[in-house]
Regions:
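Active-site loop segments of alpha/beta catalytic cores
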Residues: 1-26, 31-39, 73, 82, ...
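Segments that shape or occlude catalytic/ligand-binding pockets
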Residues: 32-65
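Extended, non-catalytic scaffold segments that flank or surround catalytic motifs
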Residues: 52, 56, 61-62, 85, ...
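Short, surface-exposed, low-complexity cationic segments
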Residues: 83-104
C-alpha cells in the first residue's frame, strides 16, 4: 500500500496497513530537523514517511511570500510584517486594505489566474500524485474577509454594517469558488477549506451570525466542489472549539475535520459522535505536548490516539498546527515518529 492509498483508505473509514501521518513545521523546525537527521531540508518529508503533500493557495499564502523581508504587501493589498519571538519569527497582518466599511464597494479582487503557488501545485500533482495524497487549499470565507477588512472591523460589520458585510462575503465566496475549481482541476485528492471560527472554549461569532453569513455560502461552495469532482474529499479546518456548528458542517458534506485540538474538543467524544461520518486529521497537541511536553508525554498522547481514534480508520495523525521551535520540539518530534513506527501498524494492538 503506498502513501496515497493509505491516506484515502483511512479517510474513507477503513483500516490501512499503518496509520497515515502528516506534520507541518515552521522554517526553524524544518532547519533543525535537517540538522538533527543530517539530511537536506527538501528530503525531510520523505525521510519522515509523511503520506501527503499540502500546497496552499489563496489569501493565506501571504504568510509565506518572503521570509527575508521585514514587511511586504501582497497581491490582495494586505500589508504584512515580520514578528520575532524567542525561537524565530512569524508573519502577521499589519494593515488591511479596506479601512472603512464602504471601501468594499470599490475594492478590486486579484485575478484567480495570478495565484503565485499554482504552478507548484501542478508540479506536485504531476510528480507525486500517484504515490502520495495531494491536499490543495485553502478556500476561505470568514478569514479571507477579515484579512481584507481587519479582524475587529469585520466583526463589527457583521452587526452594524450588514449590507457591506454581505457584499464583501459574497465577493470573497465567488473568488474562492473559482479558486477551489482551479485546485480541484489540478488533480488533488483532498480539497482543504475552512475558517478559524473557534476560540479555545467556543465560537468567535454567534451561531446566529454563522447561519446568516457563512452557513449558506459554505453550502454553496461545498455542493459545487463535490459536483465538480465526484468522490472529492473535503477537509475542513478550524482551530478551537466549534462544537456548536459541527453538526452543520457534517450535514454540508465535510468529510474530514482538522486539526482537532484536544484542549478545545475531546477527540474521543468526536469519534463516538461523528466517527461514522467524519474522519479526523491532527489530534496531537501542539500547544503543550509537542512544544513544552516531555518525550513521555508525546509517546503517551500518540498511543492514546492510536488506541481511541485509529481503530476502524478515520485518522490522519499529526500535529494540530505547524510545529514551532522550542527547547523540546526536536526531541519530541523524534519521539512522535518513533512511537508511530513502533505502534502504528494495523491492527492497532497497543
Amino acid at each position: 500500500m503506498n502513501s496515497r492509498e493509505r491516506v484515502l483508505t483511512a479517510l474513507r473509514h477503513e483500516e490501512p496497513d499503518r496509520i497515515p501521518v502528516y506534520n507541518s513545521f515552521t522554517p526553524e523546525v524544518r532547519e533543525a530537523l535537517s540538522e538533527s537527521y543530517n539530511i537536506d531540508k527538501s528530503e525531510i518529508d520523505f525521510y519522515l514517511c509523511h503520506d501527503c503533500f499540502l500546497v496552499e493557495l489563496g489569501v493565506f499564502n501571504g504568510f509565506y511570500l518572503d521570509f527575508t523581508k521585514e514587511d511586504y504587501k501582497d497581491r490582495w493589498g494586505i500589508q504584512w510584517k515580520r514578528i520575532k519571538n524567542n525561537y524565530g519569527f512569524y508573519m502577521e497582518i499589519d494593515t488591511p486594505p479596506l479601512h472603512a466599511a464602504k471601501d468594499v464597494y470599490d475594492y478590486r479582487f486579484p485575478y484567480v489566474d495570478g495565484e503565485p503557488f499554482y504552478e507548484e501545485l501542478l508540479h506536485i500533482c504531476r510528480r507525486y500524485g500517484h504515490d502520495f495524497a495531494i491536499i490543495g487549499g485553502s478556500v476561505s470565507i470568514f478569514e479571507n474577509s477579515w484579512y481584507l477588512r481587519g479582524f475587529q472591523n469585520f466583526l463589527e460589520d457583521l452587526i452594524c454594517n450588514k449590507d457591506e458585510a454581505h457584499f464583501l462575503v459574497d465577493h470573497v465566496m465567488e473568488y474562492n469558488l473559482a479558486l477551489g475549481f482551479k485546485i480541484i482541476d489540478a488533480g488533488v485528492d483532498i480539497l482543504y477549506i475552512g475558517d478559524d471560527f473557534g476560540m479555545q472554549t467556543g465560537l468567535i461569532i454567534s451561531p446566529q451570525i454563522w447561519k446568516e453569513f457563512f452557513l449558506p455560502r459554505w453550502e454553496k461552495l461545498i455542493a459545487n466542489f463535490k459536483k465538480r469532482k465526484p468522490g472529492l474529499i473535503i477537509a475542513y479546518h478550524s482551530d478551537g472549539n466549534i462544537l456548536p456548528i459541527l453538526d452543520d458542517l457534517v450535514e454540508l458534506g465535510v468529510d474530514v475535520l482538522n486539526p482537532v485540538q484536544p484542549d478545545c474538543m475531546d477527540p474521543e467524544l468526536l469519534k463516538r459522535r461523528y466517527g461514522r461520518r467524519l474522519a479526523f486529521w491532527g489530534t496531537i497537541d501542539v500547544q503543550h505536548t509537542l512544544f513544552l511536553g516531555t518525550q513521555d508525554d508525546v509517546r503517551n498522547e500518540v498511543i492514546k490516539r492510536l488506541k481511541t481514534i485509529a481503530p476502524g480508520g478515520g485518522l490522519l495523525l499529526g500535529s494540530t498546527h505547524n510545529v514551532q521551535m522550542s527547547e523540546n520540539a526536536i526531541d519530541n518530534l523524534r519521539e512522535f515518529y518513533e512511537t508511530v513506527r513502533t505502534f502504528g501498524s494495523y491492527p492497532i494492538t497497543v
